[in-house]
């Protein structure tokens, strides 16, 4: 059986990247929560 995690930087960024987060309201809420919490990295890309 193949492993489920087959890394791809392109897929990672398209799903979890900064621009993907900014593209809709809920994603912006994610960023706002992470800023409020004081995260050093808001997204996998940043």
Swiss-Prot record:
User: What is this protein's record name?
Assistant: Large ribosomal subunit protein bL34
Source species, domain of life? Bacteria
Any one of the GO CC terms: ribonucleoprotein complex
Q: Could you confirm whether the keyword Phosphoprotein appears in this record?
A: no
Annotated HAMAP family:
Ribosomal_bL34
One Gene Ontology term from the biological process aspect of the record: translation
To which protein family does this belong? Belongs to the bacterial ribosomal protein bL34 family.
Q: Which GO terms describe its molecular function?
A: structural constituent of ribosome
Q: Which Pfam families match?
A: Ribosomal_L34 (PF00468)
- Keyword annotations: Ribonucleoprotein, Ribosomal protein
Q: What is the lineage of its organism?
A: Bacteria, Pseudomonadati, Pseudomonadota, Gammaproteobacteria, Enterobacterales
InterPro entries according to UniProt:
Ribosomal_bL34, Ribosomal_bL34_CS
